[in-house]
Regions:
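Alpha-helical transmembrane segments of multi-pass membrane proteins
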Residues: 23, 115-118
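Membrane-embedded alpha-helical transmembrane segments of multi-pass integral membrane proteins
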Residues: 89-92, 118, 146-149
Length: 166
């Protein structure tokens, strides 16, 4: 999603920020910086919601080149629902990359497996029963599950908790 690019860029910056500050022994600065990136994510998320709720139809026509009402309706339904969760997606990106900056490689990998399992579950169970509505629900709901997992992993990380030597 084009609207996720600011969050992806911030995530790359956070990864560098976290790793440099870990090397400098600045645990509190890491925590403060990551929390501030979450505020950025929520502001970007609100902006995304406003833009996509106001201009989803026009953007769908512009990107698809089609004026088919069924196609445009499906696109609009998806992007508007996903827009509501765009702040969550930003927090997911920041947290995943902050963990990588801390040197935690396994947890972000587990998060990717959660995403894969969730998508398979939706494809096998929910899409046959609910149709396109399940497709719309799939990614944003998986983002929420992954974000909770990553937040727990970040804030219970031994370095972040202060139980690992700096």
């Amino acid at each position: 999603m084009l609207c996720a690019l600011p969050n992806i860029s911030m995530g790359m910056a956070i990864s560098t920020f976290v790793s440099q500050n870990k090397g400098a022994g600045q645990r509190e600065r890491i925590i403060r910086g990551v929390k501030e990136s979450y505020v950025y994510d929520l502001v970007c998320g609100l902006f995304t919601i406003v833009v996509l709720f106001l201009f989803a139809d026009e953007l769908a026509v512009l990107i698809s080149g089609s004026r088919n009402p069924e196609l445009i309706g499906n696109v609009v339904a998806y992007v508007r629902f996903a827009a509501v969760f765009s702040g969550v997606l930003g927090v997911l990106h920041q947290t995943r990359l902050a963990l990588q900056g801390l040197g935690a490689k396994f947890t972000p990998l587990v998060s990717s497996f959660i995403e894969l399992a969730g998508k398979c579950l939706f494809a096998w169970i929910f899409v046959p029963k609910m149709g396109y509505r399940a497709v719309i629900l799939c990614e944003p709901l998986i983002w929420c599950v992954m974000t909770v997992h990553l937040l727990i992993a970040f804030f219970t990380n031994p370095y972040i908790r202060g139980s690992e030597k700096e």
